[in-house]
């Protein structure tokens, strides 16, 4: 139903900017590009084209499942190990609740760590051979990011590579069809042995990993992805079509078409109860 959407943003809920923001800016290389008065700010890695919108939800914000995380790419396996050791050293300084052990998972060599806002984050590396299986495993950047930003850390975050979603284990194939046929996103060819699937837009290398789960913890709209389509006219038409056919394609919630600061958008909740924002250029 959506035609050639572009994945332009991820959205991320934390408890306090004061606690979470230093993790992003000092450990992951993110930069704040916009600040809003409604409890959100927009960050971007200089080497990556999409943004991450951070929502400050207060002390009651829940811990998010591990498989609702975002991941950053480094340039070597040794950098993954070095990053892990560095984060262990600064764990108390940044109030990191945990720093995991590097391991191989879904072809990536990576580790997870927690941040004080209730979320998990990943640092990963893919061997060059992996890029032969899928382009998403190759570098997402045109040139390496400047090392001085990470001086003394032993690693350099080259870019924000992916986000993640969950779906019900029993609904994996219907959800794949929804992503492709309704949201208009591409399904990345992957080795058949992987239990997950990847979705992305037609224009950019970053992607979203969908992880089937037996037990789910459903999140609110502060944890969502933003898809941008061609025009406001196309946005109105898409909203009308979803309103007419939403039950047929198993949409669980459809928000009103809104305009805010000259920007038009609407929210929808998909069959897996994940949230999306659909918008158009101003």
Residue spans of the language-model regions?
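Conserved donor-binding loop and adjoining core beta-sheet/short helix segment
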Residues: 54-61, 211-215
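Core segments of cupin and vicinal oxygen chelate
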Residues: 2, 11-56, 164-207
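Vicinal oxygen chelate
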Residues: 6-15, 44, 61-156, 240-282, ...
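Broad, structure-driven detector of short, well-ordered beta-strand segments within folded domains
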Residues: 50-54, 121-123, 206-210, 276-278
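Residues that act as N-cap/strand-start positions at coil-to-secondary-structure junctions
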Residues: 37, 105-107, 193, 221, ...
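N-terminal beta-strand motif that seeds the catalytic metal site of vicinal oxygen chelate
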Residues: 1-21, 70, 129-176, 225, ...
